[in-house]
From Swiss-Prot:
Ranges in the topological domain labelled Cytoplasmic: 1-26
Keyword Membrane tagged: yes
Protein location: Mitochondrion outer membrane
Designated gene of the protein: TOM5
Family designation: Belongs to the Tom5 family.
Bilayer topology: Single-pass membrane protein
GO cellular component, one term: mitochondrial outer membrane translocase complex
Keywords of the record: Membrane, Mitochondrion, Mitochondrion outer membrane, Protein transport, Signal-anchor, Transmembrane, Transmembrane helix, Transport
Organism for this UniProt entry: Saccharomyces cerevisiae (strain ATCC 204508 / S288c)
Main subcellular location: mitochondrion
Protein name, per record: Mitochondrial import receptor subunit TOM5
GO biological process: mitochondrial outer membrane translocase complex assembly; protein insertion into mitochondrial outer membrane; protein targeting to mitochondrion; protein transmembrane transport
Region (Disordered): 1-20
Pfam family, one: Tom5
Length: 50
C-alpha cells in the first residue's frame, strides 16, 4: 500500500480499468443529460395539462 514497492500493472488490468472508466463516464453523461432535459420535459407536460 503506502511506501511499499508495487508490482507493474498488467496490460489486461489496464484495459479492464480503462473500460470501466469509459463505462462510468458514459453513464455519468447519460445521467447529466437526463437531469438537464427532465425539467424541460416536466414543464412541457405540466403545460399540456392546464
Amino acid at each position: 500500500m503506502f511506501g511499499l514497492p508495487q508490482q507493474e500493472v498488467s496490460e489486461e488490468e489496464k484495459r479492464a480499468h480503462q473500460e470501466q472508466t469509459e463505462k462510468t463516464l458514459k453513464q455519468a453523461a447519460y445521467v447529466a443529460a437526463f437531469l438537464w432535459v427532465s425539467p424541460m420535459i416536466w414543464h412541457l407536460v405540466k403545460k399540456q395539462w392546464k
